[in-house]
Amino acid sequence: MEKHKNISMAVIKRLPKYHRYLEELMKNEVDRISSKELGEKIGFTASQIRQDLNCFGDFGQQGYGYNVKELYTQISAILGLDRGYEAALVGAGNIGQAVSNYSRFENLGFKITAIFDANPKLIGMKIRDVEIMDIDEMESVLEEHKIDIGIICVPRKNAQVVADELIRGGVRAIWNFAPVDLVVPDHVKVENVHLSESLLTLIYLLNESES
């Protein structure tokens, strides 16, 4: 994957949406699309789309628009989807099981190869053919396998300890579902998924629309 520096986080967070819509267009056998048409589907302006894509290169042709398949391939490469990623999930409760069971991740080259939990009732069970292991085995498993991403689905009181152990095991990216902000070294990237914050935002918008 080619490195792109000084790209704003706002632009980066819009790329997955472009990727998803382009995939839908390919499934519908759409060969090309203009920035205006793409913007109408996604909810962005044509100017915004052109500015975002120009951060990564010269895409599209004036008077022609974008070749859907080519743009999808290019955005896939920008996102790093031209290689596979192995993940370890810690916490096989309701959220952990839901994440583990989501089949679309494998289509993106993202595979959960290890699942850990401290609950004896869960240890030995399988989720999509991956056996849940005792969390005490995590250190040795991380030593034996190259795990790219750690997924934290444990209670907040345990999240930092789990993050520390994942990092010691060589994990450089963490997808955090625990309702706590983790403290990690600069070289480790964290993406938080705080469900309650998303719900509170929705509740605010609901009340604003009714006032």
Curated annotation (Swiss-Prot):
Residues 17-56 bind DNA. GO terms for cellular component: cytoplasm. Pfam families: CoA_binding, Put_DNA-bind_N. Homodimer. The lineage of its organism: Bacteria, Bacillati, Bacillota, Clostridia, Eubacteriales. Belongs to the transcriptional regulatory Rex family. Modulates transcription in response to changes in cellular NADH/NAD(+) redox state. Its main location: cytoplasm. One of its GO terms (molecular function) is DNA binding. SMART domains: CoA_binding (SM00881). NAD(+) binds at G91, A92, G93, N94, I95, G96. Keywords: Cytoplasm, DNA-binding, NAD, Repressor, Transcription, Transcription regulation. It comes from the Bacteria. One of its GO terms (biological process) is response to redox state. It is found in: Cytoplasm. This is Redox-sensing transcriptional repressor Rex.
